[in-house]
Regions:
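Short hydrophobic/aromatic-enriched beta-strand-loop microsegments
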Residues: 47-51, 116, 162-170
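Alpha-helical recognition/docking segments in bacterial nutrient-uptake
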Residues: 1-76, 134-138
Length: 214
């Protein structure tokens, strides 16, 4: 089943799960400020698998995707293809674990290729990224976005300004095929990630110890 925890306490979530005989949970999109889910994990009442949030205990497994290298690779291809030097990087949410990892990849790229980079938060929002691009993209050579949705917003801003800048995204979502402009992105295999997460939940429910999976 799918479950959204917004507005609920850890105790309310626990009661809801127990009433439905739920004993294993896969958690996506957890932020550093999500105290409710962090408490749920600490209490160890459920077998938990967290995707892209570095938390491990005896009842919790962490599935880590190499966000840093993936961001590095897609941005490097875009930068080198167009001989860019000045980068506008539109990052995700400030409190996101993946935001830190992807930004780390960008900082490594800037150092390796002797680039300059301006970083602005896009909050994984198409509209916010569009506004950032409208304000800053004109004086940059390339726009690198930490999600495809933000890349779409940035591209729409460039179209509105009638200027060309290469844009790349991250995730490989289906919508990228409908933008009308070619953009680099990196596909995340959500099906394989989710399948592995379910396998890990079953292992925990059968007495396995929590660990990190890359």
């Amino acid at each position: 089943m799918l479950f959204r925890s917004a507005g609920m306490t850890a105790e309310e979530i626990t009661r809801s799960f127990l009433s439905q005989s739920i004993s294993g949970v896969v958690i996506y999109g957890m932020s550093k400020e999500d105290k409710v889910l962090q408490k749920l994990i600490r209490e160890k009442q459920f077998a938990c698998v967290v995707v892209d949030a570095p938390i491990v205990n005896s009842r919790t497994t962490y599935i880590r995707i190499d966000q840093e290298q993936a961001q590095y690779d897609v941005a490097k291809k875009t930068v080198l293809d167009d001989n860019c030097k000045r980068v506008l990087y539109i990052a995700g949410r400030r409190d996101g674990y993946v935001t830190d990892q992807r930004l780390k990849g960008m900082k490594r790229l800037v150092k390796d290729l002797d680039l300059t980079m301006m970083v602005r938060q896009g909050d994984f929002s198409e509209l916010t990224a569009r506004n950032v691009a409208l304000k800053y993209a004109k004086n940059k050579d390339v726009v690198v976005c930490a999600s495809d949705l933000m890349a779409i917003g940035a591209m729409n801003a460039l179209i509105d300004m009638d200027i060309f800048r290469p844009v790349c995204g991250f995730d490989g979502i289906t919508l990228m095929g409908y933008v009308g402009k070619q953009m680099n992105t990196i596909r995340q295999d959500f099906y394989s990630i989710s399948s592995r997460a379910v396998e890990e939940v079953h292992q925990l429910m059968n007495g396995g110890e929590g660990h990190q999976v890359v």
